[in-house]
Amino acid sequence: AISEDDDTIVLNGSTGPHTQPKFTGELKEADSKVAHSLVLGWNDNGGKIIKELDNYVAPGSTLTIMADLSEQDMALIEVIRDEISNIKVTHLKGEISDKKTLVSLNVGNFSNIIVLSYKYLEIQESDAKTLICLLHLRNICEQYDQDFNIVTEMLDLKNRELGVVAKADDFIVGDNLVSLLLSQLSENRTLKKVYDELFRSEGSEIYLKPASRYVQLGKEVDYNTIVANAAAL
């Protein structure tokens, strides 16, 4: 059930009848795909992101980090290399707000680009660097007719409105997400189990998938059948 809040849900009291699901079509298991990702910038969340990505991609995937890393960061990446199995991690040193540097990366060769905030900088300075990077990326996209998905981390929620101009696909404001999560848990602590399930790589998630993966196209099926076929994968 999708609702604005938990107190706006009204059950109709109906418990059926339910039809017996029938298998239709040839169910197609979705395989993980080789992905080539680029991380621009760095902070303590970078290692967690690499480990999480490793759970979703196929062997042979790559992840390139371009950032100014400390010796401690480099040591962490070496440890992560030994812990992951699907991603080959490489590091390049460069300035993420310099357009020539970004052009030299051939960013069009990457399927995903993640822009991380430098948290050792002042909040506004870090977000300014991120916004400049985004503007350069979108300019490169238009100038060289390239297409790539960009996920951007920002430190100040107010700067998100400025980032819309740069047309990033998704924004993540970490502190704001934590605040929203804590407010939800304060109202209902049992939601923690739900979030734990959603945040696990093996847990339940929402994806857009072609209907042909679950049913034969052009044939009428009921909702229970779709659910049964999806659960069979």
Stretches with model-predicted labels:
Residues A1-L233:
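Cytosolic regulatory regions of ion transport systems
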